Amino acid sequence: MKITVLTLFENTIWPYLNSSIMLQAQKANLVQFEVVNWRNFCNDKHKTVDDMAYGGGSGMVLKAEPIINCLNFYKAPNSHVVLLSPEGEQFSQNCAKKLTKYEHLILLSGHYEGFDQRIYKYIDQIVSLGDFVLSGGELVALSVIDATVRLIKGVINDQSLICESFNDNLLDFPVYTRPYDLKGDKVPEVLLSGDHQKIESFRKEQQILKTAKYRPDLYKKYLENKNEKNK
């Protein structure tokens, strides 16, 4: 997979991509990253990326021309262009899985008041992290990249993916490490039993309880899917 990030702040992106799992994925040739500053595609000598909004209003609007020029240069027939904006669908684990199917992702990261509306005809999908506003789209881009890349086969252990949160709409089970007794708060005995069937059953039960307590929205989806399977 190739991922191209279009941004005005490329120095924000590279440190994360060149560390930890993202770096390992690059070294294993499982993903290729490209970070592009679309300011370089401005036609004027001042490299102007924003301007005042027609009709008035606060904030500056990102100009369409440099972004369109940049997209036309980097977009290929196999590209999928994702705009990172709070007006998009909320990003999820399922969304990340779908993104792994594309050979080339182009992530467009914004700033300021927003984009000139005329760029939207060049966009395939709009993604948001949630109903809140960030100063820019770089954090969103990195979140989308991390969640997507780690799902690419070979990046991390397959078993780790199966056990992670949001698999089957359940949060991950509680985990423990040494010491066994922390001021009277002890590790559940079943985890020390060596009985893998009992441990698996205990963990599944804890997943359900944890999801019901902390994410009732996910728990509702879990029950709906369970009932659907039992029909």
Swiss-Prot record:
Residues spanning the signal sequence: none
Family stated for the protein in its record: Belongs to the RNA methyltransferase TrmD family.
GO molecular function: tRNA (guanine(37)-N1)-methyltransferase activity
Binding site for S-adenosyl-L-methionine: 110, 129-134
Subunit structure: Homodimer.
Catalysis performed (reactions): guanosine(37) in tRNA + S-adenosyl-L-methionine = N(1)-methylguanosine(37) in tRNA + S-adenosyl-L-homocysteine + H(+)
Pfam families hit by this protein: tRNA_m1G_MT
Keyword flag Transferase: yes
UniProt-recorded name of the protein: tRNA (guanine-N(1)-)-methyltransferase
Function in brief: Specifically methylates guanosine-37 in various tRNAs.
One GO CC term, this protein: cytosol
Main location: cytoplasm
EC numbers, comma separated: 2.1.1.228
InterPro entries, per database record: Alpha/beta_knot_MTases (IPR029028), tRNA_m1G_MeTrfase_C_sf (IPR023148), tRNA_m1G_MeTrfase_TrmD (IPR002649), tRNA_m1G_MTases_N (IPR029026), tRNA_MeTrfase_TRMD/TRM10 (IPR016009)
